[in-house]
Regions:
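Thiamine diphosphate
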Residues: 1-156, 161, 172, 311-316, ...
């Protein structure tokens, strides 16, 4: 995803001399190398000074520049939170804060690098838009969308190596709108970010059981497409939410609220990171598994829930 972001921002910079990147001690090697080489005056590495990075970006944007603040997600969202709130959101300054390695992408680096609450924190800020694309193609589209906003935005990216999932999407990318990546009947999965690949793996396993599954990308977490989610809750008999975020303040909580408000009668199952600090050591997939977010764990819970419903019906 970071390479897709770098390619897109480079193209934007070729077309618009007002595009700047400010990074906090992120190596320009690989993804950012071309941008830095061709536009050295528009690539600023401020060092380990994330609060100053946000303040600087706010001032640059007030002078008419189109600024992207880029660093590892925990250091993009948590360390400079006061500056994001007061310098950007309070004054409604159009700066895009880019958090790379959202969720537990930087798995083995430990808790300081696990962004498991960032969606909740950024979504709580007035004027802030929040996007979390699921693959490189959505990353390109989300980056372009951020460049057009006249408000602050938080763009949560994965790291690298994410598969292409949206090449055959049923609907185009549109800021603030959910979209179908595939259509089926009966069951619908809502997801976002790199863990979307798990949604496809779960759907594939369900379809071996002669089930057709819809998958919807909730790439924009704020403003949330409440209408699109409400429609899914009313259309399908079973709705599943899969996310790489704490169960507190993420997509699952909001879907549950919409389901309650809409009096939806579907079976709703949610799968999130547990509400605790992560002490598991291993890869991103290892941590997913430890939190019940592997393909087999999710499929087992779905199957168990269905058996439980059938049993309750048999004794009622």
């Amino acid at each position: 995803m970071r390479d897709a972001f770098a390619r897109t921002i480079y193209q934007l910079a070729k077309e618009d001399p007002n595009v700047f990147i400010v990074v906090a001690y992120i190596s320009p090697a690989a993804s950012m190398a071309t941008f830095q080489k061709e536009f050295p005056d528009r690539f600023i590495n401020i060092g380990v000074a994330e609060q100053s990075m946000i303040g600087m970006c706010a001032g640059m944007a007030m002078r008419g520049l189109k600024v992207f603040a880029y660093t590892i997600a925990t250091f993009a969202a948590y360390r400079p939170f006061e500056q994001i709130r007061d310098d950007l959101c309070y004054q409604n300054i159009p700066v895009t804060v880019v958090g790379v390695g959202g969720g537990v992408a930087y798995s083995s680096l430990g808790g300081t690098h696990h962004a498991q609450e960032d969606i909740a924190i950024m979504s709580a800020l007035p004027n802030m838009s929040v996007m979390a694309p699921c693959d490189p193609l959505e990353t390109e589209a989300a980056t372009l969308a951020c460049s057009r906003l006249r408000t602050p935005a938080y763009l949560r990216l994965g790291k690298s190596g994410e598969p292409i999932l949206t090449a055959n999407a049923s609907e185009p990318f549109e800021f603030g709108k959910s979209r179908y990546l595939k259509k089926g009947n009966g069951t619908c999965i809502l997801s976002y970010g790199p863990i979307m690949k798990m949604a496809f793996e779960v759907a594939e396993k369900m379809e071996r059981m002669q089930k057709t599954v819809s998958i919807i990308s909730i790439h924009t977490l704020k403003p949330l497409d409440r209408g699109g989610i409400a429609k899914a809750l009313k259309t399908y008999s079973e709705v599943i939410v899969i996310e790489e975020h704490s169960e507190r303040g993420g997509l699952a909580v909001q879907v549950k609220q919409i389901a309650w408000e809409e009096k939806a009668s579907c079976r709703l199952l949610t799968f999130s990171l547990e509400d605790k600090f992560i002490h598991t050591y291993g890869s991103q997939q290892d941590i997913w598994k430890a939190h019940g977010l592997s393909r087999d764990d999710i499929f087992y819970e779905i199957s168990t829930a269905k058996r439980r419903v059938r049993w309750l019906k048999s004794i009622s």
